[in-house]
């Protein structure tokens, strides 16, 4: 009985298995016939192309699983349907990304140094940092890429340096402009549930580069819009620029992680104040300062003039125009006002275009060598004149040093006194709140130490003080004019001359202590352009001077101070101006009962 029961069970199970197989076969045949009727028989050509391409990819196992799962979905769609197109775009994006595909680095340090020096003049700190990275990569063999931020005034070569670094290392180069970026999805991409969804610009740039370790320039990172209704793009960049997180960057469109840890990110910025602090902390900051006139002349000779001669076609017959040094210097000082060389390049191009017009019309160049007198024929009258020291003939006029996002410049602080019972302080010159506060602090210090100047205190009760900073259309702010304002007030009160060819920069406190300020190199360049020979600054700024190459310091003597009295001891001479103002003090009348 047991044997018969066993046979019956086996027979039943076998029949069920056969029925199931027949059912599956029947269903598969039906699906096949339906696909053939719809024109999608043995899989679409796109399906087979993707399947073939996938065999050569070196992607992670998790990514492969997602890809093949999505590929199976593609097979189910009609090629004429919108879903097929959406799915195909997604799969093509995945297949075109360079998963674990890297270009081989050329780690020849001597060659890299030559490439960087050939393409860019100066920039020693940046070049040194790139060579350090290459050296460690050469010794260790594997290294997370640094996140570098180059900041400085416009036109100094921050963006173009990225191409040179890529050429030096033989890596792919890609650039992404962040100026005006206001939507987080531009970085992270859109989810595929949205119509017209696509990956973010980071993933698209990597796809364009065709390598997982390109040199990636994030241009104008300080111009990213913050806290918008479409999400905060600067917050999305935190994941991209964090070495601890970017090995698994998550794009909303891909919905899988992509490794960005081998990408050499180089951000550029003009002003660090507009970059959010968390983003700033993730980057290694390297300052790219402006150029002095001698450096600009060298850059013009080596790069700008040869490039523009080629661009204007003036080298076709081998008869090239030449600029002498004095002509280049005149263009720099009277036709441009910048720390970089962008405007210089435009002026050189403008001059050569004029020559190209003459040559095309007359058949020959009017002159082979361009001199200072001929620059006006080509460029017109100079729009600028050198910021020059204006002498010390007037009391109350002191030269200060300022720093803006486009470089350094000199400014003049003027103080005058006028008869008035209120003893009022007036500030003009489009000054910001911080600079106004500096003026108030400077005046209060002078009042507290009026005896050291030998002036009657009652002058503040009977004379008004007016402080003005020329070029009123230009906004001015910051605390660094503190010692300049204090010296200007002291000079106006005593009618003593200020030492010749002297400028100063430094913040002051109510106690008269001088505090360090920033932008020292840019301020030194501005002082040199103006013919200043002596600069007064805080003693704590000496460390900044020690880091500046000697070529920038040539011809300038520095005087380090700790308090305002030190400033006055050096800056105020014993000589009275030619036509001093006589401050009369009226005695108070007492009525007797």
Report each predicted region and the residues it spans.
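Extended, charged alpha-helical coiled-coil/arm scaffolds that mediate oligomerization and mechanical coupling
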Residues: 1-140
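Conserved C-terminal helix/linker of AAA+ ATPases
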Residues: 43-51, 87-88, 104-110, 317-325, ...
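Conserved C-terminal "switch" segment of AAA+ ATPases
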Residues: 57-65, 100-102, 210, 271-349, ...
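Walker A/P-loop
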Residues: 146-178, 207, 238
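AAA+/P-loop NTPase substrate/partner-engagement loops
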Residues: 168-197, 205, 225, 295
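AAA+/SF3 P-loop NTPase mechanochemical coupling elements
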Residues: 209-214, 249-268, 322, 463
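Conserved catalytic/switch belt of AAA+ P-loop NTPases
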Residues: 220-258
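Peripheral, non-AAA+ core regions of ATP-driven protein-machinery
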Residues: 367, 390, 394, 398-399, ...
């Amino acid at each position: 009985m047991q044997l018969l029961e066993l046979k019956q069970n086996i027979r039943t199970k076998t029949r069920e298995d056969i029925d199931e197989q027949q059912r599956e076969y029947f269903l598969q045949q039906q699906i096949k016939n339906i696909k053939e009727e719809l024109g999608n028989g043995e899989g679409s050509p796109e399906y087979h192309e993707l399947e073939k391409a996938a065999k050569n990819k070196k992607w992670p196992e998790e990514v492969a699983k997602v890809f093949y799962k999505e590929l199976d979905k593609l097979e189910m769609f009609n090629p004429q349907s919108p879903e097929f197109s959406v799915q195909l775009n997604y799969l093509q994006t995945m297949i075109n990304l360079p998963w674990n595909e890297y270009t081989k680095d050329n780690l020849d340090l001597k060659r890299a140094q030559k490439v960087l020096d050939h393409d860019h003049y100066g920039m020693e700190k940046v070049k040194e940092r790139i060579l350090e990275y290459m050296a460690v990569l050469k010794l260790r063999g594997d290294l997370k890429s640094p996140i570098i931020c180059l900041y400085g005034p416009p036109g100094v070569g921050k963006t173009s340096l990225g191409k040179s670094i890529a050429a030096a290392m033989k890596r792919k180069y890609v650039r992404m402009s962040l100026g005006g970026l206001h939507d987080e999805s531009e970085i992270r991409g859109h989810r595929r549930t949205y119509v017209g969804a696509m990956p973010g610009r980071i993933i698209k740039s990597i796809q364009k580069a065709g390598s997982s370790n390109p040199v990636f320039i994030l241009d104008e990172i300080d111009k990213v819009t913050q806290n918008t209704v479409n999400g905060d793009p600067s917050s999305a960049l935190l994941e991209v620029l964090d070495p601890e997180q970017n090995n698994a960057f998550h794009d909303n469109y891909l919905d899988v992680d992509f490794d960005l840890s081998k990408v050499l990110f180089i951000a550029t910025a003009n002003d660090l104040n507009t970059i959010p602090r968390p983003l700033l902390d993730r980057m290694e900051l390297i300052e790219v300062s402006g150029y002095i006139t001698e450096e600009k002349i060298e850059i013009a000779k080596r790069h700008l003039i040869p490039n523009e001669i080629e661009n204007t076609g003036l080298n076709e017959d081998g008869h090239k125009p030449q600029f002498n040094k004095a002509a280049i210097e005149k263009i720099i000082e009277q036709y441009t006002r910048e720390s970089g060389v962008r405007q210089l390049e435009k002026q050189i191009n403008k001059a050569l275009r004029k020559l190209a017009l003459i040559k095309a019309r007359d058949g020959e160049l009017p002159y082979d060598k361009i001199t200072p007198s001929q620059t006006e024929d080509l460029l017109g009258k100079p729009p600028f004149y050198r910021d020059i020291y204006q002498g010390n003939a007037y009391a109350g006029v002191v030269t200060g040093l300022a720093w803006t996002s486009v470089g350094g410049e000199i400014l003049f602080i003027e103080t005058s006194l006028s008869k008035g019972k209120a003893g009022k302080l007036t500030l003009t010159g489009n000054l910001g709140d911080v600079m106004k506060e500096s003026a108030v602090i400077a005046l209060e210090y002078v009042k507290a130490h009026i005896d050291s100047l030998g002036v009657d205190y009652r002058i503040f009760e009977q004379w008004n003080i007016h402080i003005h900073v020329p070029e009123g259309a230009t906004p001015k702010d910051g605390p660094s004019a503190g010692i300049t304002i204090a010296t200007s007030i002291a000079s106006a009160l005593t009618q003593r001359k200020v030492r010749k060819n002297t400028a100063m920069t430094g913040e002051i406190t109510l106690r008269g202590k001088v505090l360090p300020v920033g932008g020292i190199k840019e301020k030194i360049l501005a002082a040199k352009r103006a013919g200043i020979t002596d600069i007064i600054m805080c003693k704590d700024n000496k460390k900044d001077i020690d880091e500046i190459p000697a070529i920038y310091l040539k011809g300038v003597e520095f005087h380090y101070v700790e308090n305002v009295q030190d400033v006055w001891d050096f800056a105020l001479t014993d000589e009275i101006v030619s036509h001093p103002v006589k401050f009369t003090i009226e005695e108070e009348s007492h009525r007797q009962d």
